[in-house]
């Protein structure tokens, strides 16, 4: 590990020199690429330097113990040795995590697709609860939320809705939300007070650049039509709504949120690219490790990941067996406690994999 850390530190110094070179700065595209690489290494280098400093201090204190006869100074050195030993253990763990293979999509913006599942109108209302939860979470993170497409019901639910969430680390946090979410509660329309179980499916897709995926224009069928609102009534007198079908896969994306047909087409294309990229990534991951099932979950949208139980005020994440009794604040966007636990479990799984490889 130390050999790799020394290499990273040297690389960081090399990049520091490059990004301050006027000749490199003249090429803005290359300079921005180098700046990003430099920023990615910074936390590793800073942690490694802190680790080296703690090691030096530890050796210094050990030397003092050998040479010092003063009782008070020896006790101080022993106390410092104890603290530094614990600190070095913590820093070593931090460095191990920082050196784990990074998901190349972690820094990307995301699309979140929420679809009502089993449960009719109640499932559609639950889909709207989930949308609000992610919107409130994004607000806490100072991320931007943009509606891409939606299919609303008459009572305020959503049959399906897609939003873009833009901000630093959006995918790295939200990627764990893909899967089936289950709600247990008494619907407002239920006169007997019987608890119903409904579901909604969430898919989290990283936004992709044109370089990440190439779409042949001949593989697309683009239809335009008039946008409709609740209950199907027409809300636009022009054909501004857009439906794009990717013929080889049968994937269909619609967008009618904007008044401009061009803007709707741009939005629909972004979502289509993200879906195609996700499908390609899933296929690649399956071929690499088809027998590995991560304890954190596969990210498969058919996997039941979480239950929201209203009578008990309970949320249970089935992937890690975590139960919290804070349903109200959780649905108000306070979801970091679960996400942190999922991140920790994911890192532990990666460390196990690394150990098997080594």
From Swiss-Prot:
GO terms for MF: translation release factor activity, codon specific
GO cellular component: cytoplasm
SMART domains per the UniProt record, alphabetical: PCRF
InterPro entries: PCRF, Pep_chain_release_fac_I, Pep_chain_release_fac_I_sf, Prokaryotic/Mito_RF, RF-1
PROSITE patterns (alphabetical): RF_PROK_I
Keywords: Cytoplasm, Methylation, Protein biosynthesis
Signal sequence bounds: none
Location in or out of the cell: Cytoplasm
Family in the record: Belongs to the prokaryotic/mitochondrial release factor family.
Function: Peptide chain release factor 1 directs the termination of translation in response to the peptide chain termination codons UAG and UAA.
NCBIfam families: prfA, PRK00591.1
PANTHER family noted in UniProt: LD18447P (PTHR43804:SF7)
Protein name stated in the entry: Peptide chain release factor 1
Species this chain originates from: Clostridium botulinum (strain Kyoto / Type A2)
Source taxonomy: Bacteria, Bacillati, Bacillota, Clostridia, Eubacteriales
Gene of this entry: prfA
């Amino acid at each position: 590990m130390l050999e790799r850390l020394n290499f990273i530190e040297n690389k960081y110094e090399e990049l520091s020199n490059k990004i301050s070179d006027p000749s490199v700065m003249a090429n803005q595209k290359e300079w921005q690429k180098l700046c990003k690489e430099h920023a990615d290494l910074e936390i590793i280098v800073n942690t490694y330097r802190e680790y080296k400093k703690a090691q030096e201090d530890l050796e210094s204190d050990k030397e003092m113990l050998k040479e010092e006869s003063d009782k008070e100074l020896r006790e101080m050195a022993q106390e410092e040795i104890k603290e530094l030993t614990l600190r070095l253990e913590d820093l070593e763990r931090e460095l191990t995590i920082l050196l784990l293979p990074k998901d190349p999509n972690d820094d990307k913006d995301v699309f979140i697709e929420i679809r009502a599942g089993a449960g009719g109108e109640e499932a559609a209302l639950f889909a709207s609860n989930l949308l609000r939860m992610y919107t409130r979470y994004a607000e806490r993170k100072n991320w931007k939320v943009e509606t891409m497409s939606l299919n609303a019901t008459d009572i305020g639910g959503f049959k399906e809705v897609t939003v873009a969430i833009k901000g630093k680390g959006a995918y790295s946090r939200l990627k764990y939300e893909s899967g089936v979410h289950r709600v247990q509660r008494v619907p407002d329309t239920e006169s007997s007070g019987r608890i119903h179980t409904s579901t909604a499916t969430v898919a989290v897709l990283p936004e992709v650049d044109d370089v990440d995926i190439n779409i042949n224009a001949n593989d697309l069928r683009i239809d335009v039509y008039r946008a409709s609102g609740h209950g199907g009534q027409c809300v636009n007198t022009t054909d501004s709504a857009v439906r794009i079908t990717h013929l080889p896969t049968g994937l269909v994306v619609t967008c009618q949120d904007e008044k401009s047909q061009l803007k709707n087409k741009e939005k629909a294309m972004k979502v289509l690219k993200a879906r195609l990229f996700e499908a390609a990534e899933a296929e690649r991951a399956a071929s690499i490790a088809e027998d590995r099932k991560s304890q954190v979950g596969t990210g498969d949208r058919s996997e039941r990941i979480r239950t929201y139980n209203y009578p008990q005020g309970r949320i249970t994440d089935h992937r890690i067996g975590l139960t919290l009794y804070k349903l109200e604040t959780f649905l108000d966007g306070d979801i970091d406690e679960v996400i942190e636990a999922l991140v920790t479990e994911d890192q532990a799984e990666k460390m196990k994999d690394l150990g098997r490889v080594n």
